[in-house]
């Protein structure tokens, strides 16, 4: 499933007609029209689970991720861990660059023991990609999280920070190249790298 909003759904429909994929592409319009009424990343996940009546394990890949690594190792490890949730991670060269991301610390079993959202002074160079494997038995925790109005629907990092205190969340460190292309500077750098 690819979730978008009313503003961009027609663009995605045009794209989907010519996209080459071994998987069926299903577009989902979250029915929002602008940033003021958007559901947020966690809200969109909840929306798709409910709308499509999902009852299977879920792989969530944020649309602003661009990476060269394979998902196979991540998925195999997530299923092997039999963990409620696994999260894709990337090790930056410089710790100071982690200020732009969610910063993670792992224990010896690769469980997430610390999560800081965009800290001024990162305690690690290991950062969160917007990449999650959620076991079907724990999809309901998204609803539990969203019931508390203080929790942020637009920040997946806030969900993980909350979730790691509820259940085990494992991290998987990707190798290769990764970009968060959420702004033009990094989008242009990614274009130079991948094109």
Which ranges hold each PLM region?
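Structural beta-sheet core signal
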Residues: 2, 60, 87-88, 171
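Conserved donor-nucleotide/metal-binding helix-loop-beta segment in metal-dependent transferases, i.e.
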Residues: 69-98
């Amino acid at each position: 499933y690819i979730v978008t909003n009313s503003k961009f759904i027609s663009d995605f429909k045009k794209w989907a007609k010519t996209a080459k994929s071994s998987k069926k592409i299903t577009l989902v319009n979250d029915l929002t029209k602008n940033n003021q009424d958007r559901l947020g990343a966690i809200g969109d996940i909840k929306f798709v689970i409910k709308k499509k009546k999902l009852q299977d394990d879920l792989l969530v890949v944020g649309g602003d991720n661009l990476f060269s690594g394979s998902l196979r190792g991540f998925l195999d490890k997530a299923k092997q861990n039999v963990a409620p949730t696994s999260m894709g991670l990337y090790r930056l060269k410089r710790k100071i660059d982690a200020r732009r991301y969610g910063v993670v610390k792992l224990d010896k079993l690769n469980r997430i023991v610390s999560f800081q959202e965009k800290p001024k002074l990162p305690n690690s160079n290991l950062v969160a990609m917007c990449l999650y494997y959620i076991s079907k038995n724990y999809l309901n925790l998204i609803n539990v999280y969203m019931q508390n109005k203080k929790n942020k629907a637009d920040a997946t990092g806030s969900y993980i920070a909350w979730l790691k205190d509820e259940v085990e969340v494992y991290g998987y460190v990707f190798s290769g190249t990764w970009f968060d292309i959420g702004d033009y500077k990094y989008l242009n750098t990614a274009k130079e790298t991948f094109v």
